[in-house]
Amino acid sequence: MGLPLPLHRLHLVRSLVVLVALAGCVSPLPDRFPPRAGAAGNHVVWVVSHGWHTGIVVARAEAQALLPALDGERASARYLEFGWGDIGYYTAPAESYGLMLAAAVASRGTVLHVVALDAPPAEAFPNAEVEAITVSDAGFRAMLARIAAAFRRDAAGGAIALGPGLYGASRFYRANGTYWAGYTCNTWVAATLRETGCPITPAYAMSAGNVMFQARRYCRVDLARARPAP
């Protein structure tokens, strides 16, 4: 049995634990969240859990002007799904704990996974967990700005396509950002949702299940009870 910590060190450990917890707690951004009932420009976004990975789906017609030009094959898609992750782990045809560990400690770069959908998310992914979230126009634009910034660009400012994606009409693109044990694909989704102004805590979103829990609890708004737009 180890020796007990001196009292002052025990207080220090407890204080650090409290500080870490408080650092993870966030508040709503009042200029973006919550959306107002009846406000012009409210949008619906969808959060999708595929098991290990989560993604964000937006209506293409509402988003395309704020995103980099993507492949022409996506021009007819009604919706776009975005996910982010380690290039080795995300692009692998099968998930494994070995690949996950390698990504966590020695990532070789990151990618964005973009999927073109013709049907609404719940229909396109009948076996996935899907949460629909209403966001304000300011929150929607801030979220899309973060997604756009995640694309690594070529000298002409275009997105850098890497090849076909994992399912459907999808493609991988070279991405910005560093993947590590404390910042995973699910952390990225939570941080991107945070741009809508909702009080989701990215530091807690290490798993797909936590992303969905927080999205459902903190980001979903009952507009029937929301304050009306002025």
PLM feature segments, named:
Residues 27, 149-230:
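Activation targets extended, charge/polar-rich intrinsically disordered C-terminal tails
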